[in-house]
Structure formats: C-alpha cells, structure tokens
UniProtKB/Swiss-Prot annotation:
It comes from the Viruses. This is Probable host range protein 2-2. GO terms for biological process: viral process. Plays a role for multiplication of the virus in different cell types.
C-alpha cells in the first residue's frame, strides 16, 4: 500500500526540541507557526525537513516559504535525500487506515535558517500560498529562556512535540539541550530521553491527553 503524503518536521537545534508531523496525511500541504518569546538578543538555529512520499507530488509542492514577523526569511536547501517516515501516528479506525504500513519511504529535503531576534517574534513555514490551509497548521508557543513550550493550536494535524530530539534525528552538529516542560491542549508530549524507543498518543485530535514530563 502506497500512502501519498507531504510531511514536515521542524528542529530547533540548540533548544533540542522538534515538531513532528506538521503535515496532513493524504494532503498536499504542510506548515507550522512558532511564536518565540525572548527578552534579550537570541540566535536560533532551525532545520525544516519536508518529506514527500510520491514522486509526482514533488511537482505539486511549492518551494518552502518562511516568514519572520511577516518579513521573508531566507531558507537554505542544504540536502536532498531519501528517508522513511513514521505513519503510525496517522492510523485511525477508518477502513482505509487499517492496512496502512508503519513506514513510508520519502523524498526528503532539509532546509536551514538562522533567526536573530531580541523580542517576541513569530516565524512561519508554509508549502503553499493558499490561505485555505492556514487552519490546518499547528501553532506552538516557545520560551527558549525558560525552557517552556505550549501547543496553542494543533490545527487538523496529529502533530507532536519531541524533546529532547531523538538520537536518530540528530545531525552531527546538534548539541544536547535542556528538556522543555510542555502544557496546553493536548500537547502530545513525547519524552524521548536518550533512546529512540518511544510511544506517542494516537488518540483522535479532539481527545485531550496531556502528559507531564520529568527532568
């Protein structure tokens, strides 16, 4: 069974925090909005990864668009390769999901950006210019100074926040950071610790399932 999807992952490298599954299954769009709360100058390194499972969908996906406080943000495409993506998060009781495989091989693109901010800022990533998709995308509030985040809006996705970043996802220049304490409406927190073996919530998006993390 081949699953057509476009997926997005966002990695805040120095903060050791990642946002997974910011793209709808069987969709042709992905996106994410991050609200950053700082009170002093802060440099933030971000990686944005897009995954496309079907070759012909490459032509449907627009180049990644990014904005910082409504101003265009330069994104550098640093690598293109083939990887796999976890599909278990998308499984539901619906008939066409029951035989969904656990993984799907994808054409993957890795983008890089550096943010220099000194006050509250909003950064957004989009694979489309159509406003009709905006309600689909999640919004996450992050305070890097207090090591705190809150999922403001999950949109219509099964996104999840993972901190610290999974070992399998870390690139060689990532440094291990401190863990965040997450609160909010079903933040779907995943404490990955030092292992790549973890479980995440597979409940419907309407169902609240808040899990507290321990340092």
């Amino acid at each position: 069974m081949t699953v057509e999807l476009i997926d997005m992952e966002v990695y805040m490298v120095d903060e050791d925090l990642s946002i997974k599954n910011a793209g709808p299954c069987h969709g042709h769009s992905c996106g994410c909005t991050i609200e950053l709360d700082v009170t002093s100058p802060k440099k933030i390194e971000i990686l944005v990864i897009t995954k496309i499972s079907s070759f012909h969908m490459i032509y449907d996906l627009s180049p990644l668009r990014a904005k910082l406080n409504d101003d265009p943000l330069d994104m550098e495409l640093i690598k293109s390769l083939h990887t796999s993506t976890d599909l278990t998060v998308y499984r539901t009781s619906m008939l066409h999901h029951r035989n969904m495989p656990e993984k799907e091989y994808c054409f993957t693109q890795i983008y890089s950006a550096t943010l220099n901010i000194d006050t509250k800022s909003t950064v957004s990533f989009r694979s489309t210019i159509h406003d009709g998709f905006l309600s689909t995308y999640p919004t996450i509030y992050i305070n890097p100074e207090e090591k705190y985040y809150k999922v403001q809006n999950k949109g219509r996705l099964r996104m999840r926040v993972v901190t610290p970043i999974l070992n399998s996802d870390k690139l060689q220049f990532m440094d291990k950071g401190e863990m965040y304490a997450g609160v909010g409406d079903d933040p779907s927190i995943v404490d990955s610790s030092d292992s790549d073996d973890y479980t995440s919530s597979e409940e419907d998006t309407e169902e609240e399932d808040t899990e507290e993390e321990e340092d």
